Amino acid sequence: MDKCWFTLDNAHYPPPSLDSMRSGHPISPASLGHLIPSLAHLDQIINAKAIEPFPATMDIHGPTIIEDFKWDHSHEYSLSLGGKVPIPLAPAGVPFVDLNVGLGGAFSRSVANYWEFDRLERYIMQPTRSYVQKCIERDEVKRWIAKNKSMMMMGRWEVYMITGIIVARGGGRKKKEKTTGKEFSVEVTVEVPLIVEAGPGGKRNTARQKTWGTSQTGDFVWAVRLAKITKSGLHSDWKMETVFGKTSSFRGQKAIF
């Protein structure tokens, strides 16, 4: 099953009520039917004043309940470099003696994300073509399209409609830990035949660790599902498709499930 739910960077979007969404006047900036330029610009809602009211044939499905939800998403990166450079000293008048300079470096980084919720509620809707057509014909949406369509691509434009939301209830927590470490070493070795190896060496280590956490006691919209609506100058009509995590055109952002 393809992943299509994208988490929001902020936890300050209050959940909308079903009645407010059905009536076309949602009380949250993250509501079903909202049109946005991208997930990175969730605050820039194109139809912020009002959304097209849902027709009776296009109801909201949910809530689907998920209880005692835990999500751990961690990344760890590491990089190491090393090498040795031999420098013969014979041209300098010291026969059969070699000078070796060794360089080494290491870098590591780890980032951990952890969410825990008592309860998640999932709401989705399936927009019909007639509903989407009414949405893009609203004055504020037409103005946005006229201003942002690409003349370099023959008038192409795209917007994203929120078609699903996941509301976190019961107080979620988010913890992050970031650790970085650096090591840099230099070693100089003199090698002389039949003589014990000797030489100066130097090493430097630096380490840095940051740990922080936030708690969220109120309910908020945690994740959204999106439909991409786009029209090319080469086509007479627009098309719509659900955005999945593997979709490269969605700026590389990954879906969680």
UniProtKB/Swiss-Prot annotation:
Superkingdom of the source species: Eukaryota
GO cellular component, one term: cytoplasm
Keywords, sorted A to Z: Cell membrane, Cytoplasm, Membrane, Necrosis, Transmembrane, Transmembrane beta strand
Molecular-function GO term, any one: wide pore channel activity
GO aspect biological process, one term: programmed cell death
Localisation per UniProt entry: Cytoplasm; Cell membrane
Topological type in the membrane: Multi-pass membrane protein
Role according to the record: Gasdermin-like protein involved in heterokaryon incompatibility, a process that ensures that during spontaneous vegetative cell fusion, only compatible cells from the same colony survive (non-self-recognition). In N.crassa, the rcd-1 locus exists as 2 incompatible alleles, rcd-1-1 (this entry) and rcd-1-2 (AC P0DW10). During the allorecognition process, forms a heterooligomer with rcd-1-2, thereby forming a functional gasdermin-like complex that binds to membranes and forms pores, triggering cell death. Binds negatively charged phospholipids, such as cardiolipin and phosphatidylserine.
Similarity remark: Belongs to the gasdermin family.
Assembly mode: Heterooligomer; the heterooligomer with rcd-1-2 forms a ring-shaped pore complex when inserted in the membrane.
Name of the protein described by the UniProt record: Gasdermin-like protein rcd-1-1
Top-level taxonomy: Eukaryota, Fungi, Dikarya, Ascomycota, Pezizomycotina
